[in-house]
């Protein structure tokens, strides 16, 4: 999986190239300027907009090992085990560099300590921060990516230099990207004269996952026709437009919440990208 397999998101791809890919492909240039190879990027935005897919494609671009970390890989009921699990995951990444270490729903592991009542949760966050800082072992060659739908729940210490020092907003795909995603989703399927530009205009605010659902709904309906006819029936623009009418974009609820944080809790301008996207 590489960037060519992901429709749109060109600005985000360029950011990742500068921060992650080029340091791996041009190490001498970056070292000449004293820029370390590795570091952290936090991607946030509505669910279903390609954060996890982008992380996997990043690993594919640099031909690095991809290590995906979920909540269940870390959390343990016994005191001290969660911290040990986290340390072992970082050690695994360090021993197999170049490695992309990807934390999905990172806010679940790095929630704000101000909201915590239990000491164990604070200890895990302290361990996480120490691992990102490379206190006992160097993280050179380890690329740390985090994804979250709720960056406002993440402890602010994670955004300090050397940790997730680049925070990137992953918005719903724009018109051009939606057309590209629909082309990817219908690739290899029986189709007939599909007007992707028309479909892109009709799917404003749809996430990548929403667009996949559009194609899935259209295919399910077309399969019913094919089963009756006994032969495959090609998908048409009309089929996909009809499927669009049956679905609603799932991003609107997220933006309703994000808008409040962007307007009233935007310390340091971290959510300026949301304000710009919403044209506020």
Regions found by a protein language model. Name each.
Residues 1-37, 41, 53-54, 145, ...:
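C-terminal engagement/docking regions of AAA+ P-loop ATPases
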Residues 1-202, 206, 218:
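Walker A/P-loop NTP-binding motif of AAA+ ATPase domains
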């Amino acid at each position: 999986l590489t960037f060519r397999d992901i429709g749109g998101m060109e600005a985000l791809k360029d950011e990742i190239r500068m921060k992650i890919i080029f340091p791996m492909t041009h190490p001498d240039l970056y070292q000449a300027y004293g820029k370390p190879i590795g570091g952290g990027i936090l991607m946030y935005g509505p669910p279903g907009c390609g954060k996890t897919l982008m992380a996997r494609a990043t690993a594919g671009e640099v031909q690095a090992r991809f290590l995906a970390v979920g909540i269940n890989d870390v959390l343990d009921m016994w005191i001290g085990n969660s911290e040990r699990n986290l340390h072992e995951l970082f050690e695994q990444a360090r021993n197999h560099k170049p490695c992309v270490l990807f934390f999905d729903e990172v806010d679940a592991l790095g929630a704000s300590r101000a909201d915590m009542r239990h000491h164990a949760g604070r200890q895990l966050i302290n361990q996480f921060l120490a691992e990102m800082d490379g206190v006992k072992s160097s993280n050179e060659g380890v690329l740390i990516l985090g994804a979250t739908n709720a960056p406002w729940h993440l402890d602010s210490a994670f955004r300090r230099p050397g940790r997730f020092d680049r925070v990137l907003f992953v918005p719903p795909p724009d018109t051009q990207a939606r057309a590209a995603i629909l082309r990817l989703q219908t690739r290899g399927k029986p189709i007939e004269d599909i007007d992707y530009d028309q479909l892109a205009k009709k799917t404003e605010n749809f996430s990548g996952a929403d667009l996949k659902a559009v194609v899935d709904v259209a295919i399910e309906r077309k399969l019913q026709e094919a089963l009756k006819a006994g032969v495959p029936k090609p998908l048409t623009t009309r089929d996909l437009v009809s499927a669009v009418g049956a679905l609603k974009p799932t991003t609107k609820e997220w933006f309703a919440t994000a808008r409040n944080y962007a307007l009233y809790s935007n310390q340091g301008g971290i959510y300026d990208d949301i304000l710009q996207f919403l044209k506020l």
